[in-house]
Amino acid sequence: LVIIGLAGPVLNPDRARTPGSGPVLVLLDGGWGGAQDWAARMELADQLLAEAARDARTAAVIRVSQPEAAEVLPADVWRGRLPGLAPLPWLPGPQSAARLEAVLPQGQFETLWLSDALDFDGRAAVLAALEARGPVRIYQSGRAPVALRPTVVEGEALRLTALRATPDAAREISVAAHG
């Protein structure tokens, strides 16, 4: 019987990675556009916060779709809070963009923006406000979000139309209906 236990430092650290310094803001668009791959977004957020924790950095996590006052805490604390976050059924808008600027952490910080790639009113202003506070890295999924139009009843059938954010090749999607 062999039992192996590892606890930091990392077994195979990324030797090319330069440790960061100062606070980190993990910014999530947080709307329906990121719902299809929310688990992957949370996994990436966890990895980014783990890197920050290894560098003894503090962090804050904010959703653009529902900005709340930034709590700058040890990055490991935020890792424990990630499971409590969920995508919201709306996109960020100009009001949430303006509110976000008011709740950003004080001083300089690095921003790691996990974006769903959908444009929204106020996005350029958000980016400018973030860039004024420090470097910004934007992470986007390779999958464009899909929106569903309201269901249309045609006799005894239901018709549903899906809209793509980009005019790329047709793709298959799955929709689950309950009720």
Model-derived features with residue positions:
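N-linked glycosylation sequons
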Residues: 1-179
